[in-house]
Each structure stands twice: as structure tokens, then as C-alpha cells.
């Protein structure tokens, strides 16, 4: 068992999993074994059931984040924007759901249909992929290291510029909430913490 008693030292580690694969007992055991942060692919506030192949629900996502926080483990929630059936209304549901879950950190990515997967094949058939077979378009830059990823997939109701707008809007609404900022200030314990949060907010503001 990976506990300090058995190892003879404190091992700090992070993990990634699905919201439908955890329970309270497991998370408390992981915390005791040194787990610092859990990352979850929550993906969407409307289409989570479809994305996860019918195995995950919004309720499971809520429970997983609540249980993880109760175990004193930080969380990262990953969300997708720009699925083929996406509309401004479904994006709004994703942003609102992300704020409701209130993970320690949230990442919003524009959907990337890599050649060879089901989403790519469907997008090609429906004419939603804007691609000239240049593989450099599949290199993810992300917020903070070059801005929002330029979409290669559009939807029937959202253009590439619309998707970029909504991805930036998601970050703005999530990280610049007064309650989120206040909570981070309460966790500052050193100048190193202050610098880390300051640099993070400055980076986000620059890319918005």
C-alpha cells in the first residue's frame, strides 16, 4: 500500500480518471496515499452521456467532484467546446455546469477531431471540418501558451470565430469570478503562492 507508514516517506502524486469510476472510500484512500490532485474529463454540461458512451452522467460528475473535495484533494475539470451539435445554449450549459462544480482548476478546449477517430469521420462526411491535411493544425497551443486553439471543426450554428469567442468567455467567467478570486487569496501562505496566482491571472488576462 502506498501509505507513508509503508513507504517510509511521503509520496505526493496526481491522477486522472473518469467521474463514473470513483467512490468516497477510494478517494479517501488515495488522499492517505499522497494524492494531491485528481483530473476528470467531465467534457460537457449537456452531451456528457453521449461523449462517455452512455456511462457517465451529470450527477456522477457532481458526486465525483464533491467527494474529491471532501477528501481534501484538488481537482481539475476538462471541458469540450464545439461538438458537432453545439449551440450557444449548450455551451452556456457547460460553462454554468463548470462553475457549479467549482473544480480547483478548469480547462476549456475547442473540440479537436483527430484523423482516424469517429468524430473526425463524421465531421468530414458532414462537411464540418475545415482542414487542408496540414498536421500542424492539430498542435494544441492552449490558453497561456499562444492563446486559444484555432478550431479545425465548426458546427452548423457556430463559426470558428464563434468557438474562439466562447472558449475565451468560458475562461473569463470561470477564473474571474469574485468568489473564485477571493477563495484563492484565502489560500495564499507565502510570497511563492502570491507570485504563482498573480502570474496565472496575468497570463489568463493577456490571452483573453
Model-identified regions with their sequence ranges:
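A structural motif corresponding to the C-terminal lobe/cap of the Radical SAM core domain
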Residues: 2-189
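Secretory/periplasmic and organellar redox-cofactor proteins
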Residues: 189-191, 197
Amino acid at each position: 500500500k502506498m501509505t507513508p507508514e509503508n513507504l517510509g516517506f511521503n509520496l505526493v502524486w496526481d491522477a486522472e480518471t473518469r467521474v463514473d469510476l470513483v467512490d468516497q472510500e477510494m478517494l479517501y484512500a488515495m488522499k492517505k496515499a499522497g494524492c494531491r490532485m485528481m483530473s476528470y474529463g467531465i467534457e460537457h454540461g449537456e452531451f456528457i452521456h453521449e461523449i462517455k458512451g452512455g456511462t457517465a452522467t451529470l450527477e456522477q460528475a457532481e458526486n465525483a467532484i464533491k467527494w474529491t473535495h471532501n477528501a481534501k484533494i484538488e481537482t481539475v475539470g476538462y471541458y469540450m467546446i464545439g461538438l458537432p451539435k453545439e449551440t450557444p445554449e449548450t455551451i452556456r450549459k457547460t460553462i454554468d455546469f463548470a462553475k457549479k462544480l467549482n473544480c480547483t482548476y478548469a480547462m476549456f478546449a475547442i473540440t479537436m477531431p483527430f484523423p482516424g477517430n469517429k468524430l473526425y469521420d463524421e465531421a468530414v462526411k458532414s462537411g464540418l471540418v475545415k482542414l487542408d491535411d496540414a498536421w500542424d493544425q492539430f498542435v494544441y497551443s492552449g490558453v497561456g501558451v499562444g492563446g486559444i486553439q484555432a478550431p479545425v471543426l465548426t458546427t452548423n450554428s457556430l463559426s470558428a470565430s464563434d468557438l474562439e469567442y466562447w472558449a475565451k468567455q468560458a475562461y473569463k467567467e470561470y477564473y474571474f469570478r469574485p468568489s473564485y478570486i477571493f477563495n484563492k487569496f484565502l489560500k495564499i501562505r507565502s510570497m511563492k503562492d502570491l507570485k504563482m496566482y498573480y502570474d496565472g491571472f496575468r497570463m489568463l488576462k493577456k490571452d483573453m
